[in-house]
Amino acid sequence: DTGPFFHNNAIETIEGAVAFFNGAAFNSSPSGQAVGGIILDGTQVVEIAAFLRVINTLENIRQSIDLLEPVARKTVSTVDQIKRWIGQAAQETQDSIQVLSGGGLHPQAVRYLEEALKQIQKAEHGILFRGKQALEAIKQLEKARAELLEIS
């Protein structure tokens, strides 16, 4: 989800990872030659990285909503399971914030994600209003998703 990337952690950002596949080191390798080389200009590298950041964030949002829905509907059977799912939703949401912020992308979506994270953290530490807080977090996650999918 977030850097560093590759088996040796050599690349810190997704932009750097995309640029690697555009560079001479990859293009002169057997794998690069097998695909005929990749030639992108700087704008295309940034656009591909932005696309990957948004796709990653959309998947994290999907996972967070899937984890929070049973909590909101109060269909989870054990407190341990509730805590585990809420904790995982918090991690996925935090990751979404880092991924978008790291690319300077979709600041309004980041604000929705930050509000969702606040609600998730309240649900994580509360008992009485956990379902309501999970539901509010889902609403904020859905707003973030809509912001990312808006076509301009």
Q: Can you annotate each of these PLM segments?
A:
Residues 1-152:
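Periplasmic c-type cytochrome electron-transfer domains
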